[in-house]
Amino acid sequence: MVDLLVTYMEMRQANPAPARVKPAAGASVALERLDSASYISLYRAVGEPVQWDQRLRMAAEDLERLLALPSTHIYVLRVGGEAAGLCEFNGVGQPDVELVHFGLVPAFQGRRLGPFLLDQALRAVWSHAPQRVWLHTDTYDHPAAQSVYSRAGLKPYEQRMETFPD
């Protein structure tokens, strides 16, 4: 078991700032319906460095069901057609939307692509008029994660130590 400091963040209205400028030629963000193999491939590429394993522990049928839900939105950042990151939301179309996974493939980090992906994805989710978008982040996440979330308009509302399996 491992103890992690978990920070819960939320936003209750869309960020009023202008949309972020595309940081690289050929960068685009789009809602994609990924099959489970494509999803797991991107999930691993983004998540292995920060020890994501939630989706890897799911039964294949459960993952397929989750990916097929109309309330599951996965925004994929592509650079020159190559998948470079993802931003996954659950509960789109409901009052509370959870930002479940967000991150970049390590080769694409450090180029301002993360804030661009998050901004584009949040704008798309806010077009569905939720009352709140929330997430949790922890000490295993990328060191820049909380500052990226804060600049996107998310504010911390709770912190606590939680115990997770190794």
Regions found by a protein language model. Give the residues of each.
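Acyl-donor-binding surface of acyltransferase catalytic domains
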Residues: 1-27
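Short acidic/polar active-site loop segments enriched in Thr and Asp
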Residues: 73, 131, 155
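Conserved GNAT acetyl-CoA-binding A-motif
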Residues: 125-137
